[in-house]
Regions:
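Intrinsically disordered, Ser/Thr/Pro/Gly-rich linkers and terminal tails that flank
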Residues: 1-230
């Protein structure tokens, strides 16, 4: 499915967990269905909870077959079902043509950082182009080791500190910052970290109930899908 998350055998398929979609490739069956990066989760079938199969191997058994896949949307806080055809793995995004991370889709509503102010002439303003009030930081990937740091974790507060440390450790290197914007949707921002000894992103962030992932009505969602088809 794009990274190793769907292949790991130590995933215990838990209630409220699914594969968060971080990137959808052009070959993905989800591309024209209106499935969205960062806000949508692929929900594994319940039958896997009593099976030794990983989600990846379950999909491989369904190659060229039509299957029903449930998607949980953070935007509507609801589950939807799509019929897709499982394609051969072409090594770009795997069988489903997307990169994913195994996460709790309920805690994802609040485990993120809302950008509430940006310092003038800061790295956040001049290099990352963050937008106050509109942007929510979801995670970070170091392109040096390929590791994804999602803020949606049981150790959320500890990871906020580690998040800053990851930025500092990658001085002079490239990282991908995963950001959700309330008007534009998902943004993957490629940034090259400066070599400054003291680095600061230069923005103030907040989290908690009043800063949770923004919601949209189902009517808004339907209008967006209609626009994709037209």
């Amino acid at each position: 499915m794009g990274n190793d998350e769907a292949k790991k055998k130590d995933h215990k398929f838990q209630i409220d967990y699914g594969f968060r979609i971080y990137k959808i490739y052009n070959n993905s069956p989800f591309k024209m269905l209106g499935v969205k990066e960062l806000s949508d989760f692929i929900i594994p079938p319940k039958e896997l909870s009593s099976s030794n199969l990983t989600f990846e191997y379950w999909l491989k058994e369904k190659i060229n077959e039509k299957i029903n896949i449930k998607i949980y949307s953070l935007l509507t806080r609801k589950m939807k079902e799509f019929e897709i055809t499982v394609n051969e793995d072409d090594n770009k995004g795997g069988i489903l043509g997307c990169e994913v991370n195994y996460e709790n889709y309920i805690s994802a509503q609040t485990k993120l950082l809302h950008v509430i102010s940006i310092k003038n002439k800061s790295f956040a303003q001049d290099n990352v182009f963050l937008i106050k009030d509109q942007d929510y930081i979801i995670g970070l990937k170091s392109l040096n080791d390929g590791k994804l740091y999602s803020l949606n974790t049981d150790k959320f507060k500890e990871l906020i500190i580690e998040f800053s440390e990851v930025l500092s450790r990658n001085k002079g290197k490239e990282c991908e910052l995963y950001v959700y914007n309330v008007k534009r949707g998902a943004k993957v921002i490629l940034i090259k970290m400066p070599n400054n000894k003291k680095f600061s992103l230069g923005c103030d962030v907040a989290y908690g109930k009043i800063h949770e992932f923004p919601m949209k009505s189902e009517n808004d969602e339907d209008e967006e899908k209609k626009g994709l088809k037209d």
